[in-house]
Design a protein with these regions (language model features):
Chain A
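Bacterial N-terminal signal peptides that target proteins for export
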Residues: 1-11
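Bilobed "Venus flytrap"/periplasmic-binding protein-like clamshell domains
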Residues: 41-50, 60-75, 109, 129-185
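Sec-exported extracytoplasmic/periplasmic mature domains
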Residues: 35-36, 72-77, 97-101, 138, ...
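Acidic, polar ligand-binding/catalytic clefts
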Residues: 69, 73, 77, 81-146, ...
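C-terminal segment of classical bacterial N-terminal signal peptides
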Residues: 17-25
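Extended ligand-binding regions for polar small-molecule ligands
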Residues: 65-69, 73-75, 137-141, 145, ...
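Extracytoplasmic small-molecule ligand-binding "clamshell" domains
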Residues: 29, 35-105, 287, 293-297, ...
């Protein structure tokens, strides 16, 4: 019978069938699966500078990869026990539901219909993004509301297409969409004038602008036409694993609030003064065990990648080529949206 | 029971019914398995999403399409673009391929060899590379504000070729009516000439006179009705041209690229077909004093067609399937709308892929059916 299923999946070539055909009957907890397997399968983006991109020595680098490291450290106490599985926008949810990956880290907007319909659960925000427009300065456009009649280059497989349609409908304007693969093709199209404007996530536009030989001829408009909370997803009805994902992220955020960094985490763990630090780092209580993790899980994660602020600055911050400011990704007490519930 | 198995004809029917039952059971098992698993994972299934509002726009739609229209209509828009590209490429690749294929067998060795190398090079470059090359060439045309114009009516820029839009006035219907009448008359003349040929063996040329009758008559009528077509030239306003017909660079690129690519395939088929006609046929014709052009037209090509048509069906079906590469340069065909944006927005991967499979399958079968008719027409008529 298994053989028939294998043949079938080859025929239909729909990944969903493959995964489920082989492992349908047993639905064990993903945390147990990961522990038994000995490593974690982390679904990341394919190539997005600052988020997931092969860097020097062919090592993957970026914010998404750092989250995989943190998770691997939290579960195994070792930052190398994970495998990077690059997924495209088209197959990401199918990869997750068919168990090719354990967690979807690739920048994926949390939306109602995805949560409700696709058999996945949202676990936590990882990056607050928005959607904007990149345009040539010489056109003299200062606001997105002046774009009536413009030809717009959009990348396929993203929520951008819908956002643009919504925005232009709201302001009763017309546009001509050109759907081109993100990357050099889009930049070429803008440079040569195939389209008047590119739309994408603001973080992506900031890095795109830097790729032109003359970045000063281009400008990212101030308008933000959509909320894009890039989030971590797990399979539906997998509560314990979802908690691990959510609270690992929370631990990294909490660490920044408490002033724990990659450098001083050892110090803090040995001599915790603040009881909140003691609970987080496993010096007091058995907080890790509640999740089925080692008691030093948060300590291990922080010593692997640092706190949320450090991860941001190292990968996409102002000192990097991406040159992003924290903006909405500041801590709540600085006026941003990044917030961790209390560890008690 | 055994009686049935002994009768050969009944056994054949029995086998087929048995086979059908097994296949249906297999398909039923697969779909039941799939639906059960999807339900367990909490993924919604079914095609009801097709009637929901699509919420995105499509560039280069042939029919009116807006973001408030349904996913089903978005599929139709993609389907029409697929059909448009397929049709244009089939026509131009066939014409170009036949010309190249005939030239390939020219008695002039310089011609034969240069064409041979051109065909080899074109044939061995992947179709996607052809498309990307032509697309980047199209992008190197001047930008829209400095577009190249022909008498201020046709504009060429990297945002497309803008042609004036014909507006039919009422007089045009008269012209069209006359055109159809003339066409019928010319057809009648040809039939009569053929009958004369069969009965008396006298050859009466009709092609030239018929062409003259049809076009001469139509043009006269067009002038008499007072030029009933007005052309609306595109004008530059705001970001882009307004009015007129636009051939987007994506369509232009895929059209030119695949026409060239597949013309090399057609050319090779034509060469194979003509070479399959035995040399004796040429020699017999020339021994009877028949001219080279007539020999080709009346003796060689009709026989070659029997060999060319069946594999030509394959090429045409390949053209249909290869238009899906248009997604790489943003041509809004079926793979880009249903298999791209719709799939992503709804997450209904299996339904979208199924819809595409069925659509491509149906068009493929239609092509096969049409080619089958042509094949019957050119096949040896057994008497």
């Amino acid at each position: 019978m298994i053989k028939i299923k294998t043949i079938l999946s080859a025929i239909t070539s729909v990944t969903l069938l493959t995964g489920m055909g082989a492992t349908a009957p047993v639905f064990a907890d993903t945390l147990d699966d990961v522990k038994k397997r000995g490593f974690l399968r982390c679904g990341t983006g394919e190539a997005k500078a600052g988020f997931a991109m092969p860097g020097d020595n062919n090592q993957w680098q970026g914010m998404e990869i750092d989250y995989c490291k943190a998770l691997s450290s939290a579960v195994f106490g070792d930052e190398t026990k994970f495998e990077v599985v690059p997924v495209t926008s088209k197959v990401r949810f199918t990869s997750l539901t068919s168990r090719e990956i354990d967690v979807l880290v690739k920048g994926t907007t949390w939306t109602y219909s995805r949560d409700a319909k696709l058999g996945v659960d949202f676990a936590a925000y990882w990056f607050f993004d928005g959607q904007g427009f990149l345009i040539k300065k010489e056109l003299g456009v200062t606001s997105a509301k002046q774009l009536n009649g413009a030809t717009i280059c959009i990348s396929p497989g993203t929520t951008s297409e819908k956002n643009v349609a919504d925005f232009f409908r709201t302001y009763d304007m017309k546009y001509k969409p050109v759907v081109i693969k993100a990357g050099p093709e889009t930049l070429d199209a803008l440079q040569k004038g195939r389209c008047d404007v590119i739309t994408n996530d603001l973080s992506a536009l900031a890095s795109d602008r830097q790729k032109f030989t003359n970045p000063d001829d281009f400008v990212v408009l101030q308008d933000n036409i959509a909320k894009e909370p890039l989030s971590l997803y797990v399979r539906q009805n997998d509560s314990r694993w979802k908690d691990v994902i959510t609270w690992t992220r929370n631990a990294l955020v909490e660490a920044e609030e408490l002033g724990i960094t990659q450098e001083n985490v050892g110090q803090h763990a040995k001599h915790p003064i603040d009881p909140r630090v003691a609970r987080l780092l496993g010096a007091k209580g058995a907080y890790g065990e509640m999740l089925g993790l080692p008691n030093t899980w948060a300590h291990d994660a922080i010593s692997a990648v640092g706190n949320y602020g450090e991860i941001f600055e190292r990968n996409v911050g102002e000192q990097t080529r991406m040159g992003l400011t924290r903006n909405l990704n500041q801590q709540w007490y600085d006026g941003g949206l990044v917030f961790a519930p209390p560890f008690r | 029971m055994l009686m049935i198995l002994r009768d050969e004809r009944k056994r054949a029917i029995f086998d087929q019914v048995l086979f059908l039952v097994i296949v249906s059971a297999f398909i039923y098992y697969l779909s039941a398995n799939l639906i059960e698993n999807l339900n367990r994972l909490g993924i919604s299934t079914g095609f009801s999403f097709l009637w929901q509002e699509a919420g995105y726009q499509i560039g280069g739609a042939l029919i009116d399409f807006d973001d408030t229209d349904s996913y089903a209509l978005a599929h139709i828009v993609g389907l029409l673009n697929t059909l448009l590209a397929t049709f244009l490429i089939i026509v131009s690749a066939s014409i170009l391929g036949f010309i190249i294929g005939i030239l390939r067998m020219s008695p002039n060795p310089l011609m034969t060899n240069s064409i041979r190398y051109v065909i080899e090079v074109i044939r061995n470059i992947p179709s996607l590379v052809h498309i990307v090359i032509w697309f980047s060439l199209a992008l190197h045309l001047p930008p829209v504000r400095q577009s190249f114009d022909i008498y201020n009516t046709v504009f060429i820029s990297n945002r497309g070729i803008y042609l004036p839009d014909p507006n039919f006035e009422s007089g045009m219907w008269g012209v069209l009516f006359l055109f159809i009448c003339l066409l019928a008359y010319a057809f009648f003349r040809k039939r009569k000439a053929q009958q004369l040929m069969r009965e008396t063996g006298k050859y009466q040329a009709t092609f030239l006179s018929n062409t003259l009758i049809i076009w001469g008559g139509t043009i006269c009528a067009y002038l008499l009705f007072g030029l009933p077509i007005t052309w609306q030239a595109p004008t530059l306003s705001g970001f882009d041209f307004d009015g007129g017909i636009t051939i987007a660079p994506e369509l232009f690129a895929i059209w030119i690229a695949l026409s060239i690519y597949f013309s090399s395939h057609v050319a090779e088929l034509v060469r194979g077909g003509v070479q399959s006609v035995s040399k004796g046929q040429f020699e017999a014709a020339s021994a009877l004093g028949v001219r080279y052009s007539i020999t080709m037209k009346m003796v060689v090509i009709p026989q070659a067609m029997r060999v060319i048509v069946p594999p030509l069906t394959n090429v045409y079906q390949n053209i249909l399937k290869t238009t899906s590469l248009g997604v790489a340069i943003g041509y809004a065909e079926m793979t880009a709308t249903t298999g791209g944006t719709t799939l992503n927005l709804t997450g209904q991967a299996i339904e979208c892929i199924l819809l595409m499979m069925v659509s491509y399958g149906i068009i493929s079968l239609i092509i096969a059916a049409i080619m089958d008719q042509i094949n019957k027409h050119v096949a040896i008529v057994e008497r």
